[in-house]
């Protein structure tokens, strides 16, 4: 199996290579840094909605 790209690591070479987090797959998020011309920077990120969902699930686990 091909190695996946860890959280916050560069994924511009393969946008579908991000690893899985505890419950969700990270997404390759790209942006253009200010002052740079057409140099796209991509890294594996955890979407905010996933962070919130993980917090809710963790809380549910601790209250059970």
Swiss-Prot record:
Residues 45-64 are annotated as: Linear cationic cytotoxin domain. It comes from the Eukaryota. Pfam families: Toxin_35 (PF10530). Residues 1-44 are annotated as: Knottin domain. GO terms for cellular component: extracellular region. Keywords: Amidation, Calcium channel impairing toxin, Disulfide bond, Ion channel impairing toxin, Knottin, Neurotoxin, Secreted, Toxin. It is found in: Secreted. GO terms for molecular function: calcium channel inhibitor activity; toxin activity. Disulfide bonds join 4-19, 11-28, 18-44, 30-42. Belongs to the neurotoxin 19 (CSTX) family. 05 (U4-Lctx) subfamily. Negative results: does not affect mouse P2RX2 or P2RX2/P2RX3 purinoceptors. The toxin (and its derivatives composed of N-terminal or C-terminal domains) are inactive against a number of bacterial strains. The toxin is composed of 2 domains: a highly rigid N-terminal inhibitor cystine knot (knottin) domain and a rather flexible C-terminal linear cationic cytotoxin domain that forms amphiphilic alpha-helices. Enhances the high-affinity desensitization of human P2RX3 purinoceptors. At 50 nM, the toxin decreases the IC(50) for ambient ATP from 2.67 nM to 0.77 nM in human P2RX3. This is Purotoxin-2. It comes from Alopecosa marikovskyi (Wolf spider).
